[in-house]
Swiss-Prot record:
This is Beta carbonic anhydrase 3. It comes from the Eukaryota. The keyword Nucleotide-binding does not apply. Its EC number is 4.2.1.1.
Length: 258
């Protein structure tokens, strides 16, 4: 099917209106509608580009140019003390929540902040994201942060038992990593509402990820030698609280901030 050029379309419209002048008002209305749609489309693209530009200029003026010593240091190397696993959810950026500065934390974000068990044949992206900061950068702390209203956990809790993932290409397969958390919550919290079950699963899924971290030899070795600490956390952006706990698989926080 051939595509008519802009010039040909305008020419054909002109010829039609010259023959049928009574269509003038109809054509004017359609042209106005098309013009409005094109202007809106162009405006949306412009807004996105301008947001990116203005965001960088703000960063450069208020951060980069005011901290030459820091950026000269970062240009040479990085020595982060934290490796953080956090959700890709746009509401839970760990750098904002914990006020991490550039160079302070190596951050890995994915759906529902999950860490799969050690397996050389799959999830190599997570394995690489673990291996590099631990074996090369020698981070001293791993923190896995769950959060309130997590869509990944809600999706996990909603999957019917003993059924294969069918609705999505990647998501359902990924969130099954923390199926043990779902199973435990379904058993231990069966009398709670679905919403409360999800809240509990947000925390229990963190514990599953903490356990999975120990399946990586280079993680386990450093934990045993007290060279690496592993902690779980839960950020509630509805209540404005942050719970932190040690690697004892208890959801009772070591301390809570509010």
């Amino acid at each position: 099917m051939s595509t008519e050029s802009y010039e040909d379309a305008i020419k054909r419209l002109g010829e039609l209106l010259s023959k049928k002048s009574d269509l003038g008002n109809v054509a004017a209305a359609k042209i106005k509608k098309l013009t409005d749609e094109l202007e809106e489309l162009d405006s949306n693209k412009l807004d996105a580009v301008e947001r990116i530009k203005s965001g960088f200029l703000h960063f450069k003026t208020n951060n980069y140019e005011k901290n030459p010593t820091l950026y000269n240091s970062l240009a040479k190397s990085q020595t982060p003390k934290f490796l953080v696993f956090a959700c890709a959810d746009s509401r839970v950026s760990p750098s904002h929540i914990l006020n991490f500065q550039l160079g302070e934390a190596f951050i890995v974000r994915n759906i529902a902040n999950m860490v799969p068990p050690y397996d050389k044949t799959k999830h190599s992206n997570v394995g690489a994201a673990l291996e590099y900061p631990i074996t090369v950068l020698n981070v001293e702390n791993i923190l896995v942060i769950g959060h309130s209203c997590c869509g990944g956990i809600k999706g996990l809790m909603a999957i019917e038992d003993n059924t294969a993932p069918t609705k999505t290409e990647f998501i359902e397969n990924w969130i099954q990593i923390c199926a043990p958390a779902k199973n435990r919550i379904k058993q231990d919290c069966k009398d709670l509402s679905f919403e409360d079950q999800c809240t509990n699963c947000e925390k229990e899924a963190v514990n599953v990820s903490l356990g999975n971290l120990l399946s990586y030899p280079f993680v386990r070795e450093r934990v045993v030698k007290n060279k690496l600490a592993i902690r779980g956390a839960h950020y509630d952006f509805v209540k404005g609280t942050f719970d932190l706990w040690e690697l004892d698989f208890k959801t009772t926080p070591a301390f809570a901030l509010s």
